[in-house]
Amino acid sequence: MVNKTLITAGDSIVVSVPAFSEYALNGLVEGAEIREVPANFETGQYDFSALVKAVDETTCLVWICNPNNPTGTYESVEDIRKLVAAIPKETLVIIDEAYIDFVTSVAVPTSRALLDEFPNVAIMRTFSKAYGLANYRVGYMMTPLELANYMQTIRLPYNLNTLSQVAAEAAFGDQEFVARTVSQNAEERAKWESLFDELGIHYYKSEANFIFFAAPDAEGLADAWLKSGYQVRRGQREGWLRLTIPMPQDGNVMRKILRDFMN
């Protein structure tokens, strides 16, 4: 809906790559030019100076996914603040915080404070990740009132059913579940990072519920896991895989398969 509201054919949008594919895909549908800025290959972090250079008078949107999908990397609020300050106020910066609940490295990871500092910032959240409601399709956006009112004029009626609303309210009220989920994810994520370090596998430091890593034979490893019933995401970069952090018992099995494969 954001794309339909803001993009006119001939506009450009700026995205870091690799990134969630829907940013570019939805922009193309609306006739936008997609300007892709490669992330730092060694760390997976955004190249903010290159993002700023990619923005010009045609740019209507800059997408920031934080933590980023598929790299899992987290960008500091201060770095995002500097980005917003460096681009024209006519360009909207959308910060997708779908995975923000999984961040454990900082006490307050959200960029919410930037809404009070800049008129061209919007933040998206979802109940699909840490709250476990992917099939209910519940999300929301924090944005300046003027933009919210403008988007309301094209919003489809009945876009959120009653069952989804009730489920979201119940999930939001169960913060103990969210805390438990985040804690277990961090614990299991650390086990994978430790094994990758041991095996000399290049990976990006993740603050999400997945890890993006390079494998000597990515397709072979993915096939080995698949034979045991475990599917990982392929195709987002040649030679790399995105592994969603599994439950503890499944993680033990998958790590054994990885060890055997590497040996």
Indicate where each model-derived feature is located:
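Active-site pre-lysine segment of PLP-dependent enzymes
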Residues: 28, 45-58, 70-93, 97-128
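Phosphate-binding glycine-rich loop
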Residues: 1-12, 30
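PLP-dependent aminotransferase class I/II
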Residues: 120-197, 201-204
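Conserved PLP-binding catalytic core of the aspartate aminotransferase-like
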Residues: 186, 195-228, 245
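Short glycine-rich anion-binding loops that position phosphate/pyrophosphate groups of nucleotides
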Residues: 20, 66-70, 100, 129, ...
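PLP-dependent enzyme catalytic core of the Aspartate aminotransferase-like
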Residues: 78, 219, 224-228, 233-263
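Short beta->alpha connector loops at strand-helix junctions that form conserved
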Residues: 17, 36-41, 236
